[in-house]
Amino acid sequence: MTFSQAPTPSSENQTQLIQNAAELNTDPRQSKQMPLALKALMVKPTFFNVENPINPHMRKADGTLHALNFNKVQEQWTMLHDAYLKIGIPVLAIDGQPGKPDMVFCANQSLPIVDNSGNKLLLLSNMHNDIRHSEVPFIAESLISQQYKLAHLPARSSETLFEAMGDCLWLPGKRFLLGGYGHRTTKAIYNYVSQIAQAPVALFELVNPRFYHLDTCLSIINDDTAIAHESAFTEPGLKLLNKIFPNLIPVTLKEADSPGFACNAHCPDGKHVLIQQGNVQINSVLQKAGFTVVELPTDEFIKSGGSVFCMKLMYF
């Protein structure tokens, strides 16, 4: 495959990493405006399976891998696909690839960016797992057709790992990122991410292996509201989260851990919250706060450690 590439960031570009609440000197809502990413890419689950055990949710209590009901897999994927269409989010559905059983979790392979000049860039991941890293070119090829140019990190190594929108999340409508590290993404890589995205990055060390990505313990609802599970974060991380989000809503371990996976919810438009069904407590809180909760069954995908947010990539 031959791809057009974005220019490499220069050393003149500023890097701004925010590691604690004291370093957050301005309100993130005052950051430069950015468009909302209101298009979804999804990968068809043709080759989805639980066979590459890379997170704790893939195993049952006895240590064996979860078995999937493949009819339910297709039904649940289609329900999520159709739920996006129903709320006005167009979906680009691409084929999975044989030998890549986790490619359906397409939030992880790339970070879509609109730079200060309006150019659409796709920052490609250096994924922790070899099989998952082999998915990256297929996602890249799909978004090149959507007028994206590619941007690359330094060569993949144990020091340069980055799992994109599994760990790196935009504050909606703002040039401001939240970045998780510790399990799949390395802290140092955010110097490069900040440069190429032309955005400050608030950093969060993830300390609970059951919440291996930032998107498993934090769901950003809008620019002042988020839901989060506290045991995934350090105390400084929680203080920083509370400073960024005036309305930070806690999620219990029961609903955040599998099979609830509530913090892997997705609110694409500041109104509709797509979330695994049955999370009674957090769903009630969100409804009382004025959000429209769309409950969906994703339990077959949770057997592999992902739910709504993992199953799509939002792009501009």
Name each model feature, range by range.
Residues 1-316:
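The feature marks the mature, well-folded catalytic cores of soluble enzymes
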